[in-house]
A protein has these predicted regions:
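Solvent-exposed, non-transmembrane regions of membrane-associated and secreted proteins
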Residues: 4-247
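Conserved small/polar residues in nucleotide/adenosyl-binding loops
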Residues: 248-254
Length: 254
């Protein structure tokens, strides 16, 4: 009798562990998304409550930073390789940081149900929390001769992040919300490169680009997937319609 009870308890333990392993990614991602939503709410409230003069100063400082990048020559490095922060990091981290905590704003990719805060930098710690803006690229406020780069991990067991970026197609839409401004980008180019081939992320004169970057292939991570969007007119209808479509391609309705 005791042996039967022991075997039964062992089966229950094994089943419990198995169920835990199966459910962990779903539960973990649910908790991650709740936390991300809370941060996004804080960012939106901060932008809504911002003093007009302070807001103007922040935007002008970001525009100045972007103008200097457009006229200079920056050598971009793989965002998924840890680099020692340079002397400009302090100034960079102070820009678009009204909500504190290093959050610039947030990105929405309705086609793949992604909504993530955008942090300054691409350190390992940052990319565990959400999307990271690649230092050395234009700040995500748009404008002529700008090219922002937003990075995110693929394949984390604790959160989805940019795992489904491979599902995007040319013509799909994504949206940036920064300092109360809303920017829309339509995917116009998708490419796969080696980590050292960062020249595709450079600024093009007169263009307003934002590129999303993640590792690929899934679980191997030897290459980088680049999903570039070109700025297009933002309307509330575009974002709302894209949100209704969910995982179906945004192209047919937006």
């Amino acid at each position: 009798m005791l042996k039967k009870i022991g075997k039964f308890l062992l089966v229950l333990v094994v089943l419990g562990i198995s169920m835990g392993l199966i459910l962990y990614p779903f539960v973990s991602n649910y908790l991650f998304e709740n936390r991300a939503d809370g941060i996004i709410d804080t960012v939106e409230k901060t932008a809504d409550d911002a003093d007009e003069e302070k807001y103007k100063e922040e935007i002008e400082a970001a525009q100045k930073y972007n103008a200097e990048l457009a006229t200079g020559h920056v050598v971009l490095k793989d965002p998924f390789v840890e680099e020692k922060l340079d002397e400009d990091a302090k100034e960079y981290n102070s820009l678009l940081n009204m909500a504190d905590g290093g959050v610039m704003g947030f990105i929405k990719i309705p086609c793949i149900d992604v909504s993530l805060p955008i942090y300054h930098g691409t350190s390992a710690e940052i990319l565990e929390l959400g999307a990271g803006h690649l230092q050395g690229t234009s700040l995500p406020i748009g404008g002529e001769s700008t090219h922002s780069v937003i990075t995110g991990h693929t394949g984390l067991s604790s959160a989805k992040l940019f795992t489904d970026l491979t599902e995007l197609e040319e013509g799909d839409m994504f949206f940036l919300h920064v300092m109360g401004e809303k920017l829309a980008y339509k995917v116009d180019q998708i490419s796969v490169i080696l980590p050292e081939e960062m020249d595709k992320l450079t600024i093009e004169n007169g263009k307003d680009y934002c590129t999303l970057v993640t590792c690929t292939p899934y679980g191997v991570n030897t290459h980088r997937l680049l999903v570039r969007g070109e700025r297009t007119e933002y309307t509330e209808d575009k974002e709302e319609e894209a949100g209704k479509i969910g995982r179906v391609s945004c192209r047919e309705r937006v």
